[in-house]
Amino acid sequence: ILKAINDAGVDAVVGYTQRFRRRFLTVKERLIQGQIGDVHSVVTRAFMNRMVPIATIAKTNERHNLTPMVVSGTHSLDMSMWLLEGKKPVSIYAKSVDKVLSEWGTKDSTFGIFTFEDGTIFSMNISWGLPVVWPGSVYGLEIGIVGTEGVIDIEDTHRDLVLATYKNLPGGYVPEGFEPSVDRHVDFLTSYPPGDIYKGQLWGPMREETNSWFARIQGGLDTPHATAAEGHANLIHTMAMDRSAKFGKEIALPIDPEDFYKD
């Protein structure tokens, strides 16, 4: 698909919704301006309620392909790689654990370290095995970015807006037929990545993303969308993390996509 896109010269983009949030756009602009110098160290931590993998995995028999990195970690990895734009990853070493979600055929957590051509290191960590009662309805993210002249510390866990009630609260991701296994009474509001509903209307990042896409195709604006090539690279990097964890060894990058089908 990517080859066809490139051969046709099509402006194909991928919807990584986090890119359209004000806080991350602000961080991106400060990095473009060089306000913390040359970035050399990044640490990213994503925490997710286990309702998401349980609800997602129920839809397929190919459960070994639905890992925390490939399904959900791709969003925080994309954000981190976008903020590291211009730097080339040359290796990844990762580890995974499956103490809880093994009965559903997936991993609980995957932690990894990317090394870049210029020596920059990026620690990418995700756990989507948090309890159903965890107040974050979907995603909680922390990113630390250290440069030669400064640092940017991003706290995006949504703990600044908390709802507690005697009434049972729904999950953030509840496809048809899925019911949380226990009652939930506390929510970190705004932790649902696409945005929030007000009077039947969606407000938030996905609204911005959609309007920005219209502006891109109508007016030729240079928008924050991920290109098809960036989306493909994100997929390859998440799969490389899983491959490293599977075989217990560092994986050189870039990796030939065909290698994923050899064993």
Summary of predicted features, one role per range:
Residues R22, M51, D153-I154, N234:
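Short catalytic/ligand-binding loop motif for oxyanion handling, primarily in non-cytosolic enzymes
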Residues I1-D11:
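Rossmann-fold NAD(P)-binding glycine/threonine-rich loop
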Residues I1, V27, A240-M241:
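Aromatic/hydrophobic pocket-lining residues that form π-stacking "cages" and hydrophobic walls in ligand
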Residues V39, W134, T223-A226:
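Short, surface-exposed helix-loop/turn micro-motifs enriched in polar/charged residues
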Residues V10-V13, Q18-G105, I113, G248:
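Predominantly a Rossmann-like dinucleotide-binding segment in NAD(P)-dependent oxidoreductases
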Residues Y173-D263:
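C-terminal helical cap and adjacent loop that interface with cofactors, partners, or active-site loops
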Residues L77-P170, R207-L221, T238-M241, P254-D263:
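Contiguous beta-strand/loop segments that form the cofactor/metal-binding neighborhood of enzyme cores
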Residues D7, R22, H75, E208, ...:
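A non-catalytic, amphipathic alpha-helix used as a structural packing/dimerization or gating element
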